[in-house]
Amino acid sequence: MRLARLLRGGTSVRPLCAVPCASRSLASDSASGSGPASESGVPGQVDFYARFSPSPLSMKQFLDFGSVNACEKTSFMFLRQELPVRLANIMKEISLLPDNLLRTPSVQLVQSWYIQSLQELLDFKDKSAEDAKTIYEFTDTVIRIRNRHNDVIPTMAQGVTEYKESFGVDPVTSQNVQYFLDRFYMSRISIRMLLNQHSLLFGGKGSPSHRKHIGSINPNCDVVEVIKDGYENARRLCDLYYVNSPELELEELNAKSPGQPIQVVYVPSHLYHMVFELFKNAMRATMEHHADKGVYPPIQVHVTLGEEDLTVKMSDRGGGVPLRKIDRLFNYMYSTAPRPRVETSRAVPLAGFGYGLPISRLYAQYFQGDLKLYSLEGYGTDAVIYIKALSTESIERLPVYNKAAWKHYRTNHEADDWCVPSREPKDMTTFRSS
């Protein structure tokens, strides 16, 4: 609980600067003496940096920065301001979680990682960008922070599971935790994107097999190739467990440039995460729904590139799910899986937490896309991934801590303003006419 109290400050939120001027205001506040140096300790530092909105970058900006005269000094100057802002914004929201959730060892551990990373970044706020040693040490720090945060997602997930097992879940808490985790994990994806870009571009350990990548971005990401890779790896798991697997039927249509391969500027690992998760779900449903028949319908994938959207539709005949359960598939608090142990980052990611679909949807939404499920109970499910076709429109979707966010945690959610149907029909014979 000490960490929770440490991070809790006042509840008032100052007006946030517009994105274009956020960095300038941050720099000028620091120079004028109203910056974090004049604040006391971690709470003051968090309060100061949380006053500013994160600056969302487009895929084109990521690409242009990394491909045209990539400058480590420029990256240093941007990240030493932007990373504390992103960390502080979400740290303010962590402190608004229920006390019993904040007391769990796993959430305490996550908080300690964020505090340590913020403090390490602030060590560079007054250092010269002209000093080669400073730039080298900063890159080292970025890599260290990235590695420290490897297990943030499963560790926070374990904290939620610990809380649910000890205290149960009421509708209001469930709604607030769902709201928080969507924002927390989206923030984590965005922070990791910045850390990865800097460390891959300037850390000197880029993969030789990915020489055409700009950091983690492939300017010509072959969508079909990533889909096939995800299918093959999911199929291996399916074969191990069920000793069989459904075939893949894949169709592609490039409506934008007919006859050309479907390629977009994207992060292949993000797309892989989404399709791998969807393939696993589709295969499991298909194998179990048709177990008594011994014949397994193929999984059909349609890939279409239009002027605005790249769309991937995956269709299975795994029996589908009822409409009332669709939203639960994206609910972090709903998973009934037994609690797994978080031991090392080499373990199967998120195994047993039931977080595959909600995290996949966040990856899709991160650059203004989406992931949706459409199910026909008794027949099968269509999963559709939407990705922006233009790199200028693929812009980071970032949470910001402001009055609206604060009110969401502090407002008592009122009862629904629609009638709740009773489980049994009313006995109309009990009503007498006067």
Swiss-Prot record:
What Enzyme Commission number does this protein have? Answer: 2.7.11.2
Q: What induces it?
A: Up-regulated via the HIF1A signaling pathway in response to hypoxia. Down-regulated in response to prolonged fasting.
Q: Which residues carry this modification: N6-succinyllysine?
A: K403
Q: Give the transmembrane region(s).
A: none
Against InterPro entries, the record matches this protein to:
AK/P_DHK_N_sf, BCDHK/PDK_N, BCKD/PDK, HATPase_C_sf, His_kinase_dom
Q: Where in the cell is it found?
A: Mitochondrion matrix
The record's Gene Ontology biological-process terms are: cell population proliferation; cell surface receptor signaling pathway; hypoxia-inducible factor-1alpha signaling pathway; intrinsic apoptotic signaling pathway in response to oxidative stress; peptidyl-serine phosphorylation; regulation of acetyl-CoA biosynthetic process from pyruvate; regulation of glucose metabolic process
Task: Read off the transit peptide span from the entry.
Answer: 1-26
Domain named Histidine kinase: residues: 161-391
- One MF term in the entry's GO annotations: identical protein binding
On this chain, the residues bearing Phosphothreonine are T336
Record-listed ATP binding positions:
277-284, 316, 335-336, 352-357
Reaction it catalyzes: L-seryl-[pyruvate dehydrogenase E1 alpha subunit] + ATP = O-phospho-L-seryl-[pyruvate dehydrogenase E1 alpha subunit] + ADP + H(+)
Q: Which UniProt keywords apply?
A: ATP-binding, Kinase, Mitochondrion, Nucleotide-binding, Phosphoprotein, Transferase, Transit peptide
**Could you say how this protein's activity is regulated?**
Activated by binding to the pyruvate dehydrogenase complex subunit DLAT. Strongly activated by NADH plus acetyl-coenzyme A. Inhibited by dichloroacetate.
Gene3D superfamilies (alphabetical): Alpha-ketoacid/pyruvate dehydrogenase kinase, N-terminal domain, Histidine kinase-like ATPase, C-terminal domain
For this record, the Gene Ontology CC terms, alphabetical, are: mitochondrial matrix; mitochondrion; pyruvate dehydrogenase complex
Assembly and interaction partners: Homodimer, and heterodimer with PDK2. Interacts with the pyruvate dehydrogenase complex subunit DLAT, and is part of the multimeric pyruvate dehydrogenase complex that contains multiple copies of pyruvate dehydrogenase (E1), dihydrolipoamide acetyltransferase (DLAT, E2) and lipoamide dehydrogenase (DLD, E3). Interacts with phosphoglycerate kinase PGK1; the interaction is direct, occurs under hypoxic conditions and leads to PDK1-mediated inhibition of pyruvate dehydrogenase complex activity.
Described purpose of this protein according to its UniProt entry:
Kinase that plays a key role in regulation of glucose and fatty acid metabolism and homeostasis via phosphorylation of the pyruvate dehydrogenase subunits PDHA1 and PDHA2. This inhibits pyruvate dehydrogenase activity, and thereby regulates metabolite flux through the tricarboxylic acid cycle, down-regulates aerobic respiration and inhibits the formation of acetyl-coenzyme A from pyruvate. Plays an important role in cellular responses to hypoxia and is important for cell proliferation under hypoxia.
Q: Would you tell me the protein name for this molecule?
A: [Pyruvate dehydrogenase (acetyl-transferring)] kinase isozyme 1, mitochondrial
Tell me which species this is from.
Rattus norvegicus
What is the phylogenetic placement of the source species in the record?
A: Eukaryota, Metazoa, Chordata, Craniata, Vertebrata
